[in-house]
């Protein structure tokens, strides 16, 4: 059978149903191209237009599709290997970025793809044919044998990228690459669930990443991103909920070599559900509980790590531990909490299913006899053909997990249970070559497969857990049967009486997050995961250093001198991989410290707790965990002085440090200050019984001073009590007696520092008998060379390997901390913050949230009643006033615009009585508003009316220039008019050089009076020469380009990831945002490439850099005069070289009426505000370093009012009462003010400013507010309008406050923060702070009007509206010209009421 993708049909005579058989035949061969789902135009596929960044029209789905926990009715297909539930932004905003994206994304191969010039095609359709749905169902049931066993899709959506190529820069003489990719995505859904299939046929991936367009000549390639993202932006960029499958080129290469379905190249995922779905869940072949593996996972799965590890040349895999750090055991397919990169590993080549499984996979797997056995080591070369039998008396535990995981985690052997024989093993299993080898099912819960009934155990006994003393956990309702437990058997089915018994289901929260919970017949126990140790309730990483903090108090009789001290500090540091323990106690009085020198048990406790373990032994922490009581009684000889030491451990603090308090009471012999104590190496025997450890021994020590050497001794009796778990089988207990060997004991008191120090090196093992000395493995005596944060793995003889402990990464000889918060390897859930610690991390809930019982999930603290929502407020009716909630039961009332009063009572404002209309207009008052209409014989918007009369002079016989001149002169007679009056020569023709009389701008015109593009000059400069243009010349290289070329030559043409290369734009100017190599460490630069202080950011938040060089002029250019706006309220926004006009209908955006108000070529307009009294718009220009204004009258032209003393003017605010303007200058770090005509200029502030940006004014109350986005200490400040009473208003929980506005009606100060992604408001005094919206993209400026906020956004390059009441994003406007928008302001038809 063959598949003809071009024709879109099967080659006759084979029917489509045979495709199912072909795909699911019993083989492990790679997916072939003809095994893709059928596609082609004959199947109803639509074709995406050719291009580099194309997007399909919305595909309206017949039935909404579930993605994560939401439903969507539309899908969009993009050129760049991606599907979304909403239209895509420009590709530059996502195609070169890592996950998460800012929009919902389903990405089978996200890269910069280009189908221009017929390089491949992209097809898509919705399909309901039975053949396609049946094939999709088979795939899903294969990968999800439990939850997907009854999945019957009703609809499918298919997208196929066929022979598509990567975007390539056009180079002279270079032929396009012949590397083309083919892949397919299928979304299958029913009314409850959605599954995704990603299919990569053999040889279908010929390129594995693409170069960013901004990389210029740097040979940088970004690997394709594969995965899913819900698209919600949280406080930190990398905390949005997402699932990522790839992160390196090698992992992309292996997409068609590995699988989680059993066929290399085929992948399945559960991506949406009506039930709770924490994150995308990958498929698991043979995921039935009866065939799950029999040992706990040592760490979380990681697709990316497994794909990366599976190289084309070797099966060798080195575990870097980044995937191991903080996850508890989970099943394949379980999605972890939080927003982190989900780590799951799969391989298709070896993954058996039980022959008696009810959900046996239809996909083939090698027989268990073909499975290799691996020796436990740091790294192993895996040979699938190797067979290795276990020693006699051992059972080989075959790990029925995904074999790609075997690349990371080696096989494990455990002793066979006493008395176990072949007759008592699970029936139906294949005998592995007549060896004493058996595979056992896992009975742990499968979180990703909820509500699955569990079959009873039939003649089944579980082996010991791979780690001594651990038994695998079970599904709900099943208990582990130990050989010493009492059970009843009937018909070979075990039954139990579980009445009044604590179970893991209700008590799992008592276990450490690094432990699993196991149910036994009498209760539950906690057991630490592999690579951790402890008592299950407290677990710490193996090999990692540990710290102890505590207090020491004492009441001693030193000789005949009483000495007392209280709560002095104790700190201990333990290098656990070689058994060293260091203890320091500060501020103990000198006589007591000197006398306690021989009392080594004070610090010796930590040596026993974290001693090096010899095989078959356990140190103290493995027994006690972090809660115990250590009682010591020391009796000195010959004086019989007796002292008692009590050390109480109180658990682990949030940084995983052991907390311990010590109390010392009794009598100790006096030791003179000039004596030191020497203690020889010694052994102690510790006896274990139930929850008590005891030890008694005698010890001698020497007191030395010069030639004096005195030998004394004491007897030590120790008793350590703790709470052991009594439910586990007793045969799992530690040996009754263990020997602690202490070497290199050391005690010293430093009188200068006031610190008493102890140091010991410890090993614990079985009781030794005298025998001939043998070579000791360095792992047991601490002589290895592993890093202090690495585990030492003993090998044969004196061989060993080193492996970094969880929370660290490296080669084992050198390890560095893993920042789980930055890399995403953490379990902090939504509404929580991850805080990195050395070797670990902790989760903290955000404000307003608290931890749930699992200590990872943060749940909302129930808010107090909101009077504004429940209707219990006392404000005026909704149409007259609005209720403002201030937290708790506090609220205030504010009259709506057009009404006046207390807010509790509001009355209509008669605007007509205030003469708001033009003198030639009629005013009509309405409740809450008014309107103006020009009288007959006049035209205009009512606020300005002009006469309809024609100029008195006859127009007959006038040339165009003369006519326009006469008309302009007539209009100029009206007060306030700034229209240009054309200049004509003696013959009535246009003078080639035209200049505006009031503004000073000059330009050339043609014979029809039309401006010649590009000839306009600003005031004060040399007028243009109105003649033919000069011949073009080649542009010389700029400073940026020369610097870039020099560095690239220095780096040998290919810089490393950590080497800086300047980024230049097409004209050679420095790009305002510069970053260090591939890192997220970025900063802003000026036009000369100099870093702007205070702009350097940490990874996660890019600084908001504003360009200082205007883009080139695009011809033809429009005239620099005002196109009059429509009547009513509208928004004005700055967009680089133009000011845009966006009308409002109420509070809704009238997007179809939006247009350009004023074109200002050669400018970069940033700040903008409006003077409501004279109807003039003001703006700052960072390219021209000026502040200008223009009237909103027809034909009015810009007027520059401040031309000097500016470097980077950004924010601008107008006080229409006092006729004053205020602005920020981030180049000079100043805040200034001046009259609206530029006079009376004054610097208000020039200190304690780093990056001042937004500024706003409350003219009625006389307050000024501004933001400073200094990356080290962002803040919002306020002062009076005269610069008095300056103070910080907000400096907590803000990141990059770009936008600031004061609402004169609600009296609220509000700001938009691009760092925290929040829109927040507060009262003018800084109280009553509340969040309006916490999922913004990248806001720049914000303004308030009526019941909405409007902000410009740099991610969407548009204007976004946000409801004040609900906080929801209600609408957006994206201008046709896609570039960054800066300032925004609202233009009212009247001024807000009030007086100075």
UniProtKB/Swiss-Prot annotation:
Residues 1020-1033 have a biased composition (Pro residues). Residues 346-355, 379-388 have a biased composition (Polar residues). It is found in: Secreted, Extracellular space, Extracellular matrix, Basement membrane. Its main location: secreted. Residues 544-774 form the Nidogen G2 beta-barrel domain. GO terms for biological process: cell-matrix adhesion. Glycans are attached at residues 379, 468, 674, 719. The keyword Manganese does not apply. Residues 500-540, 775-816, 817-859, 864-907, 908-944 form the EGF-like domain. Highly N- and O-glycosylated. Residues 958-1026, 1037-1105 form the Thyroglobulin type-1 domain. Interacts with LAMA2. Interacts with COL13A1. Interacts with EFEMP2. Cell adhesion glycoprotein. Might be involved in osteoblast differentiation. It probably has a role in cell-extracellular matrix interactions. This is Nidogen-2. It comes from Rattus norvegicus (Rat). The gene is Nid2.
